[in-house]
Regions:
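PAPS-dependent sulfotransferase catalytic domain
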Residues: 3-6, 10, 17-19, 23-285, 291-362, 367, 449, ...
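PAPS-dependent sulfotransferases, especially Golgi type II membrane carbohydrate sulfotransferases
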Residues: 1-90, 278-463
């Protein structure tokens, strides 16, 4: 480093030197320091070039690349990804699009369609580490992986470390799919659900002796007091105004949540596949379009695994034998795993739910068993009938509970009623909505006009 500083001083003007020194100061990656030492001449040549001046200095790019991103050899390794981050290299630009999804606009359903029906890999941002560098590295490795032919990037929150740098390393001219929804519906989603369910405080594995009513208790909805946190809403649910300034707004396509409802989703995905050049939904995956993503709280219950074992048959829990002898030592080795999960495609497993129940719950979940295990369990009629009886009772109660939850859950009308009773909040949220929806109003006034409850809110504001 002692020899590096004089070289930088002699070969870069103070402004360019500060760019390089700031990057070194921001990193704790020894491999980055070594790279700079070994390639300092190339770095200085690039920083002094007219191309660097015209592309990055004149545009006041906050994180300009320290080497020419057009002439580098890279791969899908973690090493290259971390080095690229420290060098401020933009992410490779061959992702199909960026999907901006404020909390509550149907992102879970849309991402399911992309990943499972259209062969587009797009990780839900809320499942990635809450660190912009880690997200950048994950995307960088995937975009350099030759085995991944269709990739998209999801952004659904803004309150993560180094997020400004992350955004600056995305292409300004990226194609954008921006999820939107009647903001009263967004508030209903945020205020009306018990988000403590996300913590999943229940065992994920059980056996035939387990009292499944504990899961039913978890699924049971409890109305909670509305707690308004404006900062939290603006970091997760009303994020468009802060995000879109980082991109070319002419490249933004607005996707109203209504267009991915169960009746419209298939046509919408076919249309988007043509517009954004990705694989349209496969015919064999059409059952996935019948899923209601947020039906009660089953989204947060599954997956759970029943380990079915003949040794537990005589102590199986039923509603009429609640004081059965519980087996707290589940034998995973000699048991057959039966997985309760949301509906999905897995060629290695068989979904046996329709051997257990025949109602609309079959659209939203499956009961999965390995093909080899299915052949085994069919040979053991007593075990198979016990599994089906145990799960039939369990699934029956699941349906009752989630249907009751749906009926009790907050509705858009309840949000409007809340504003009528708390008029002091109307002006605050009017300003939030105006800021959030300013570009949408210019580009897609038809979407705004279709929002029944937002327009009711405007009438409240107007008095």
């Amino acid at each position: 480093m002692q020899n590096l500083l004089p070289y930088i001083k002699n070969n870069l003007n103070p402004m360019l030197a500060q760019i390089l020194l700031q990057a070194l100061q921001n990193s704790n990656n020894e491999k980055f320091f070594t790279f700079v030492l070994e390639n300092i001449e190339m770095i200085c040549t690039w920083l002094n070039s007219s191309e660097f001046r015209d592309k990055y200095l004149s545009t006041k790019h906050p994180y300009p690349p320290l080497i020419n991103p057009e002439f580098i050899e890279t791969d899908a390794s973690r090493h290259c990804a971390e080095l690229a981050w420290d060098l401020n290299l933009p992410l490779p630009q061959h992702y199909k699009f960026i999907y901006i999804s404020p909390h509550g606009v149907g992102a879970a359903a849309f991402l399911r369609y992309l990943n499972q029906c259209c062969d587009v890999i797009c990780f839900a941002s809320w499942c990635l580490p809450a660190d912009a560098k880690e997200r950048y590295c994950a995307h960088y490795m995937c975009l350099n992986d030759n085995a991944i032919s269709q990739y998209a990037i999801n952004i659904s929150e803004v309150n993560i470390p180094y997020f400004d740098k992350y955004l600056s390393l995305l292409d300004f001219d990226s194609k954008i799919i921006c999820g939107v929804r009647d903001p009263i519906g967004i508030l209903k989603h945020c205020w009306g659900r018990d988000w403590s369910k996300v913590l999943r405080n229940y065992p994920s594995e059980f056996n035939l002796t387990y009292d499944w009513r504990y899961y039913i208790h978890y699924l049971t909805h409890k109305s909670n007091e509305i707690k308004i946190n404006i900062e939290e809403l603006q970091q997760g649910s009303f994020i468009l105004s802060s995000l879109l300034k980082h991109f070319n707004k002419d490249k933004v396509y607005y996707l109203d949540m209504e267009e991915i409802s169960q009746s419209k989703a298939l046509n919408t995905m076919n249309s988007l596949a043509f517009k954004f050049d990705f694989t349209p939904p496969h015919n064999e995956h059409l059952a996935l379009f019948r899923i209601k993503e947020f039906r009660g709280y089953i989204r947060y219950l599954f997956p759970i695994t029943l380990y079915a074992n003949s040794k537990d048959i005589h102590n199986t829990f039923y509603l009429n034998t609640p004081k059965n002898n519980k087996n707290f030592n589940t034998d995973k080795i000699s048991s057959i795993p039966v997985i309760l999960d949301r509906k999905h495609i897995n060629p290695q497993k068989i979904d046996i739910i329709q051997e257990i129940i025949k109602n609309d719950l079959c659209d939203d979940m499956g009961v999965y068993i390995d093909k080899d295990d299915f052949e085994k369990v069919k040979q053991n009629e007593l075990l198979f009938s016990t599994i089906k009886h145990y799960l039939r009772d369990f699934l029956h109660e699941i349906k009752i509970t989630i249907d009751e939850t749906e009926s009790k859950m907050m509705k858009e009308k309840d949000v409007i009623d809340y504003f009528e009773k708390n008029k002091s909040l109307i002006h605050t949220f009017f300003n939030i909505f105006e800021d959030e929806l300013s570009h949408l109003k210019q580009k897609c006034p038809n979407i705004i006009a279709s929002w029944k409850y937002y327009n009711k809110f405007l009438k409240l504001y107007q008095g």
